Amino acid sequence: MKIRPLHDRVIIKRIEAEAKSAGGIVLTGTAAQKSTRGEVLAVGTGRILDNGDVKALAVKVGDKVIFNEGYGVKTEKLDGQDVLILSETDILAIVEE
């Protein structure tokens, strides 16, 4: 199945954080936090401005990002894998390696 996001929406695959503490203790269950990093899988056409123009998104497919997992984030299954659908405004930063 393919999903094509609309407007300023972005589809992200979560990059799982390592489940170890700084001291090397393996974290399980509720002790392990969900990662707020992900890889952009698809982007919409852009944000529609008040004057009707469309502004292209700052992120592109393949970007590694840090996002805010808040109220507007939707989780969906895509080919057996959980993906997140969120607005570009929920993306806090692009990780440059």
UniProtKB/Swiss-Prot annotation:
PROSITE patterns the record matches = CHAPERONINS_CPN10
GO terms for molecular function, please? ATP binding; metal ion binding; protein folding chaperone; protein-folding chaperone binding; unfolded protein binding
In the UniProt record, does the keyword Cytoplasm occur?
yes
Q: Where is it mainly found?
A: cytoplasm
Entry GO terms, CC: cytoplasm
User: Pfam families given for it?
Assistant: Cpn10
Name its GO BP terms in alphabetical order.
chaperone cofactor-dependent protein refolding
Report keywords, A-Z: Chaperone, Cytoplasm
Q: Which InterPro entries match?
A: Chaperonin_GroES (IPR020818), Chaperonin_GroES_sf (IPR037124), Chaprnonin_Cpn10_CS (IPR018369), GroES-like_sf (IPR011032)
Kindly indicate whether the keyword Cytoplasm belongs to this entry. yes
Location relative to the cell: Cytoplasm
Role according to the record = Together with the chaperonin GroEL, plays an essential role in assisting protein folding. The GroEL-GroES system forms a nano-cage that allows encapsulation of the non-native substrate proteins and provides a physical environment optimized to promote and accelerate protein folding. GroES binds to the apical surface of the GroEL ring, thereby capping the opening of the GroEL channel.
Quaternary structure?
Answer: Heptamer of 7 subunits arranged in a ring. Interacts with the chaperonin GroEL.
Q: Which family does it belong to?
A: Belongs to the GroES chaperonin family.
Spell out the HAMAP family in the cross-references.
CH10
Q: What is this protein called?
A: Co-chaperonin GroES
Q: Which organism is it from?
A: Aeromonas hydrophila subsp. hydrophila (strain ATCC 7966 / DSM 30187 / BCRC 13018 / CCUG 14551 / JCM 1027 / KCTC 2358 / NCIMB 9240 / NCTC 8049)
